[in-house]
């Protein structure tokens, strides 16, 4: 192919790449400021265009067109050329002048290094430099990585040593700076052998604008340096950044033993990690090196339980038990199956019962295997719960006598945050510290009578108090799992089969041969009449158009699904005289919200509404407005008799507490309508507690409201999760049942209503999740005064765009025996924004904000703890009124909530842990639901902090960051001037990265979620 034809075939992308190389050459020869087009053309033609000594590149006009097309250059009216200031700049790559090179080649002798040409099996040893040489070297090292381990590249070899004035550990040099000044690091290339070697080339394998390289002899392949024995040569690395964070560079040094063409080059790689730390970062750093904790899950051979005494006098139970609740103890086969599956054993190992269980686990859910499959999944989950809770076991703990001489006090930091959950009526096990390793031990059962902040009051046996306990005696404390919820789920799935709920759980179609049109209702909340989707949902629920199939209210964030459910409940009560309604939710807070909205609306007689709490509910957590409509009276919890409970038209409780109604003998014909709000938060078997035995499949109507695009229930067993336990009934129906799938245009309103009016967020905050998860159908309908409140905030990178992505090159760290990750550099940025929000006087048009209006979200428990510590330690916040009302928590803790301002710390800043996130479904990366929840909590201002190079490996995050770039909302570390992190670095650093060997679930290790107590 001729030179002319070759250039014609080049794509615009290829031409643009040539242009970027030219800009880099200008930068590296200190001529970037030149803007005269004629001068640039001369430089291009004389020094760059034929730099390979072969085929010329396209003419300068074509290159300039490609750069302008990509917004990398612009041409003024006067004919001057201005290159984008953010075009990649960075590590100097020792360019050369091709004309001089060609002259040298013309005069080369066989012994001259310039005559070296690569053989087909050699490393990149051709006499070229600059970007192309670097890329060639990168490709070469990548190919070698397929067959060679990391140690090969970091090892000194053939007598050549690459050292530093600083300590080098495993090929890495760490430098730390505490101010924005130039830091200079000296690297020494030394020949410790007996023969001379040639230092032919050195470069960075990835580009970062914060480093520069320099050496006095300007070593390139065209200007190699001969190193005599014992000779040492200096290479200077300079670092400077104005942004706190961690910056990495991977440097490759190339050498040859001689200048013969057939001589193979060899390489030595060094990693440089520069940390620019603030005082806050120093305060929050690791307390001690991370050492994985191996849990002790062994049990003594013989164990005697010394029974304590449970709390009494706080419960009046008039609801007689009619249907007993089975024990449902996990069989031994379940534990064996879990171990074999965890070890990824060959299927040939499975025999008999284990083979049947494996087959059941791998089979799809049907009504025929419904109970058995859920039994197995629940057993797997429970086994993991028993393991995970052992992380909280404490050794060498002392007790103290309470003022109530029947009780003992025990300090338990973390119990106030449900880590672990400890409720009244639960029990703990105490073992004398000196007897922990004995094969025969006595464990003393202590029942929880009261929970007071981080202290519990235990009721132990009289024998313990009188004969065993001595002041300052030390014990191991073991926590236990409350099995009631999981037992209720087992019973529910079996009752679902016994009561033949197939048409509810696996619906085919409505039985009505002549389906009635939904009535034209006059709604109590008149605003809903102007929202077609909400109005349609209420009318179809009242008409029962889906029966016996459940009716689904698909409610994306901020679309008013709870308001819709409340209106539907009120309309059913009004229009169907013989209706009796059971309204449930997975959590007490969601159930309380339902009850509050019903009572305060005054459209239903409050005497018809009753809120039923579990016996473990703390009276302090019950809203005052519900005191007259619930079963809690001062310090007493009262379970009314069945007849009294059946007299209420609307009964509200959690899904788990609904199981108490089944135990109490409620008829399946009593409730005509069962509503489940936040149905996406519950596992299917938990939802079924409120259905099986309480709803007639022929006559009753089940209504589920939620969003399958948001986070589901928190589970611990990877096996249970991987085999579907994390899929809610709502999500299963919407994704696997044809009745609920979208048609050519929309959903079938007889079975499902998708709410599309968002009343929460500013349109720009809603933009990306709307496009990613909701087909672009959501319409921003929030109050403009509220949603636009921060559009003119002085700290916005782009006025009118209340979304910020702040790029931070941070560092994933762990400490002590906690495997949870934290990133102190992101915390530094978050605290800075918090001060700008709370401590600076708001300008005209921006009202003052209070801590309760701000939420900070992080995916890992340790990051949450560090953020809280940073706020507590900051003197500016110590006396700030209401600072305790600022919520910092995980994504799961914020689901269903909203704040005026949301700040998010993404934490992940290392490629080597991305596979960990994806495999175990933790963190933000590779988890669309967690991303969706995080970005949809904010009403007026959303601030994201993270590492853009890492996050852009994920599609959702990539779309979000690109959106911020397009709209001018990006700030922090420059992203357009940084080449995407090369595979070299990630593969060199991430070879054989594996999770620690432990019995704990990944969720427990990294996220450390609350143990549920909200039943």
From Swiss-Prot:
Pfam families, per the entry: AAA_11, AAA_12, MOV-10_beta-barrel, Mov-10_helical, MOV-10_Ig-like, MOV-10_N
Q: Where does ATP bind?
A: 555-562
**What UniProt keywords apply to this chain's record, in alphabetical order?**
ATP-binding, Cytoplasm, Helicase, Hydrolase, Nucleotide-binding, RNA-binding, RNA-mediated gene silencing
Q: Which spans does this entry mark as compositional bias, Polar residues? A: 109-123
**Which cellular compartments is it found in?**
Cytoplasm, P-body
One annotated GO molecular function is: ATP binding
Q: What are the GO cellular component annotations?
A: cytosol; P granule; P-body
Region of interest (Disordered), residue spans: 94-130
- Taxonomically, the superkingdom here is Eukaryota
What CDD domains does the entry give? DEXXQc_Helz-like, SF1_C_Upf1
SUPFAM superfamilies documented for this protein = P-loop containing nucleoside triphosphate hydrolases (SSF52540)
Name the InterPro entries for this protein.
Answer: DNA2/NAM7-like_C (IPR041679), DNA2/NAM7_AAA_11 (IPR041677), MOV-10-like_beta-barrel (IPR049080), MOV-10/SDE3_DEXXQ/H-box (IPR026122), Mov-10_helical (IPR049079), MOV-10_Ig-like (IPR049077), MOV-10_N (IPR049075), P-loop_NTPase (IPR027417)
EC code(s) of this entry? 3.6.4.13
Q: Which reaction does it catalyse?
A: ATP + H2O = ADP + phosphate + H(+)
Q: Name one GO biological process term.
A: miRNA-mediated gene silencing by mRNA destabilization
What is the documented function of this protein?
A: Probable RNA helicase. Required for RNA-mediated gene silencing by the RNA-induced silencing complex (RISC). Required for both miRNA-mediated translational repression and miRNA-mediated cleavage of complementary mRNAs by RISC.
Name the PANTHER family on file: BRCA2-INTERACTING PROTEIN-LIKE-RELATED, CANCER/TESTIS ANTIGEN 55
Q: Which family does it belong to?
A: Belongs to the DNA2/NAM7 helicase family. SDE3 subfamily.
Q: Report the protein name in the record.
A: Putative helicase mov-10-B.2
């Amino acid at each position: 192919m001729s030179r002319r034809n070759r250039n014609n075939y080049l794509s615009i992308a290829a031409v643009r790449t040539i242009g970027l190389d030219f800009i880099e050459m200008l930068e590296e020869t200190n001529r970037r400021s030149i803007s005269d087009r004629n001068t640039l053309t001369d430089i291009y033609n004389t020094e760059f265009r034929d730099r390979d000594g072969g085929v010329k590149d396209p003419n300068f006009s074509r290159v300039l067109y490609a750069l302008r097309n990509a917004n990398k250059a612009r041409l003024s009216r006067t004919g001057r050329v201005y290159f984008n200031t953010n075009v990649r700049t960075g590590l100097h790559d020792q360019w050369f002048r091709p004309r001089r090179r060609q002259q040298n080649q013309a005069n080369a002798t066989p012994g001259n290094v310039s005559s070296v040409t690569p053989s087909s099996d050699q490393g990149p040893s051709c006499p070229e430099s600059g970007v192309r040489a670097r890329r060639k070297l990168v490709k070469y090292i990548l190919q070698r990585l397929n067959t060679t381990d990391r140690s090969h590249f970091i090892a000194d070899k053939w007598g050549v040593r690459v050292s530093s004035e600083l300590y080098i550990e495993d090929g890495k040099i760490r430098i730390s700076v505490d101010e924005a000044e130039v830091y200079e690091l000296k690297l020494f290339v030394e020949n410790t052998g007996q023969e001379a070697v040639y230092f032919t080339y050195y470069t960075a394998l990835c580009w970062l604008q914060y480093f520069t390289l320099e050496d006095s002899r300007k070593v390139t392949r065209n200007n190699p340096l001969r190193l005599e024995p014992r000779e040492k040569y200096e290479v200077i690395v300079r670092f400077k950044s104005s942004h706190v964070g961690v910056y990495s560079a991977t440097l490759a040094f190339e050498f040859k033993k001689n200048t013969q063409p057939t001589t193979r080059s060899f390489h030595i790689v060094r990693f440089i990690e520069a940390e620019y730390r603030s005082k806050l970062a120093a305060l929050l750093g690791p307390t001690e090196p991370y050492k994985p904790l191996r849990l002790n899950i062994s049990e003594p051979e013989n164990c005697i339980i010394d029974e304590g005494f449970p709390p009494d006098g706080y419960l009046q139970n008039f609801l007689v038990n009619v249907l007993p609740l089975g024990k449902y103890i996990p069989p031994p086969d379940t534990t064996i199956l879990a171990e074999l599956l965890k070890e990824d054993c060959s299927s040939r190992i499975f025999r008999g019962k284990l083979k049947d269980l494996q087959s059941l686990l791998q089979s799809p859910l049907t009504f025929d295997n419904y109970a058995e499959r859920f039994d197995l999944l629940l057993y797997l989950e429970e086994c993991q719960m028993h393991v995970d809770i052992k992380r909280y076991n404490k050794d060498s703990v002392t007790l103290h006598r309470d003022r109530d001489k029947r009780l003992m006090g025990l300090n338990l930091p973390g119990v106030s945050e449900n880590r672990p959950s400890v409720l009244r009526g639960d029990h703990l096990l105490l073992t004398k510290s000196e007897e922990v390793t004995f094969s025969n031990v006595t464990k003393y059962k202590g029942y929880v009578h009261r929970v007071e902040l981080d202290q519990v009051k235990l009721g132990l046996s009289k024998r313990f108090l009188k004969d065993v306990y001595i002041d300052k005696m030390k014990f191991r404390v073991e926590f236990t799992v409350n099995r009631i919820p999981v037992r209720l789920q087992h019973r529910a799935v079996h009752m679902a089969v016994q009561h033949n709920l197939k048409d509810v759980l696996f619906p085919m179609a409505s039985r009505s041969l002549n389906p009635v049109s939904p009535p034209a209702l006059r709604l109590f909340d008149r605003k809903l009449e102007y929202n077609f989707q909400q109005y349609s949902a209420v009318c179809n629920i009242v008409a029962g158009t889906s029966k016996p199939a459940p009716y689904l209210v698909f409610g994306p964030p901020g679309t008013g699904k709870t308001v819709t459910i409340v209106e539907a409940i009120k309309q059913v009560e009004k229009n169907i005289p013989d209706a009796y309604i059971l309204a449930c939710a997975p959590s007490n807070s969601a159930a309380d919200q339902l009850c509050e909205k019903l009572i305060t609306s005054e459209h239903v007689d409050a005497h018809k509404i009753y809120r039923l709490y579990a016996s473990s509910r703390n009276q302090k957590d019950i809203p005052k407005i519900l005191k007259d409509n619930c079963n809690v009276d001062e310090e007493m919890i009262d379970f009314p008799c069945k007849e009294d409970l059946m007299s209420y038209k609307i009964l509200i409780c959690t899904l788990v507490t609904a199981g108490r109604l089944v135990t109490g003998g409620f008829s399946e014909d009593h409730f005509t309508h069962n509503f489940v709000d936040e149905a996406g938060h519950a596992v299917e078997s938990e939802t079924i507690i409120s259905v099986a035995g309480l709803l007639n499949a022929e006559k009753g109507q089940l209504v589920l409201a939620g969003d399958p695009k948001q986070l589901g229930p928190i589970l611990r067993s990877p096996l249970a999760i991987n085999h579907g336990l994390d899929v809610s009934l709502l999500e299963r129906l919407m994704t696997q049942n044809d009745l609920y799938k979208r048609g050519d245009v929309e959903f079938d309103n007889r079975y499902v209503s998708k709410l599309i009016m968002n009343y929460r967020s500013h349109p720009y905050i809603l933009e990306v999740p709307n496009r990613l998860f909701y087909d672009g159908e959501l319409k921003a309908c929030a109050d403009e005064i509220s949603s636009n409140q921060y559009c003119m905030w002085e700290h916005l990178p782009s006025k009118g765009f209340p979304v910020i992505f702040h790029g931070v090159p941070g560092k994933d760290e762990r400490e002590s025996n906690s495997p949870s990750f934290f990133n102190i550099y992101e915390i530094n940025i978050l605290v800075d924004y918090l001060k700008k929000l709370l401590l600076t006087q708001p300008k005209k048009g921006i009202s003052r904000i209070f801590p309760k209006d701000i939420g900070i979200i992080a995916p890992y428990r340790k990051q949450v703890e560090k953020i809280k510590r940073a706020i507590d330690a900051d003197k500016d916040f110590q006396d700030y009124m209401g600072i305790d009302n600022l919520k910092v928590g995980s994504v799961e803790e914020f689901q269903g909530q909203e704040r005026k301002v949301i700040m998010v710390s993404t934490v992940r800043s290392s490629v080597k842990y991305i596979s960990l996130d994806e495999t175990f479904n933790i963190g933000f990366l590779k988890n669309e639901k967690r991303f969706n929840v995080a970005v949809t909590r904010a009403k007026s201002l959303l601030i994201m902090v993270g590492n853009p190079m890492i996050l852009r490996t994920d599609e959702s995050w990539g779309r979000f960051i690109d959106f911020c770039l397009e709209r001018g909302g990006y700030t922090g570390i420059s992203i357009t001037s940084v080449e995407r992190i090369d595979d070299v670095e990630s593969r060199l650093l991430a070879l054989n990265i594996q999770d620690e060997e432990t019995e704990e679930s990944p969720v427990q290790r990294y996220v450390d979620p609350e143990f549920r107590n909200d039943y």
